[in-house]
Amino acid sequence: MSIQDQVRRELAEFTDAESRVARALLGEYPMAGMETVARLARRAETSGPTILRFVARLGFDNYAAFQDAIRSEIQARLQSPLVRYDSIATKSAEADTTDRVAQALRRNIEIAAQDLRKDIGRITALLTDLDRTVLCLGGRFSGMIAAYLYQYLRELRPGVRLVRDGTAAWADYLLDVREGDILVVFDFRRYQRDVLEFARSAAAQKAVIVLVTDIWYSPIAAISDVVVACPVSIPSAFDSGVTGLAMVELMTAGAVEALGPRSKARIATLEALRKPFNLSP
């Protein structure tokens, strides 16, 4: 579990002063955690001893150990496929690649599904509120996962948009964002500045931000209303997108159940409209 994840999970248990530290840390994570004790205390409008009590409560012997853990997270966040090649090359040649990867995929999905459980009710309520527009956004690779969610949702309900066409046109999508609209954004490590800036702009327009990210947390987590964390590591030079796709399947299943006859009627209408375009009977 990342420090950010731990702080989020324990937020309700902190004292008032510790909660100010937690919010300051989450608001500019991980860089706030790399500041001096004095500077973080000023950011949180509290004292140095409160900062030290806060990191002790997280399980660290001292502030230096706390910062070492954050450095390790940052290093893991920024790993490129080229770096991961070295670790993959050390695996036993006798080990079965299919088994190792399949086991990792199963484990990742189980962990992410458990994390989603606490928020699935809220996510379902948001995605099935027909008074809200839903925007789906992803990055260079995660854009395909955003498109996957979009393809499902547009059959279930009106008012769903996929943010695409290149960043030069992204402002056009922001133009009509209203308070309460939803941005479902997929952002995984080697996070993209353009995706972050779009999310910030949507949040500034009071959109609800639902973030699907990895266990190291995209910077978008600091402005998100709901965060779903997906393990993505597998025995490969590349991170896996399967867990993100599985979260889309789970969210879609929840939406289907919640919308019930309304989505069924919409799909029936769509199927009738498609008939003239189908080659097969």
Which role does the model predict for each range below?
Residues 3, 54, 62, 69, ...:
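Residue-level recognition of specific faces of alpha-helices
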Residues 6, 20, 24, 53, ...:
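Alpha-helical scaffold segments in soluble metabolic enzymes
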Residues 261-281:
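A short, charged, Gly/Pro-tolerant segment at domain boundaries
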Residues 10, 17, 28, 130, ...:
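Heptad-repeat coiled-coil/leucine-zipper interface motif in alpha-helices
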Residues 2-4, 13-23, 27-34, 38-119:
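HTH-adjacent hinge/linker in prokaryotic transcriptional regulators
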Residues 125-259:
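Glycine-rich phosphate-binding loops that contact phosphosugars or nucleotide phosphates
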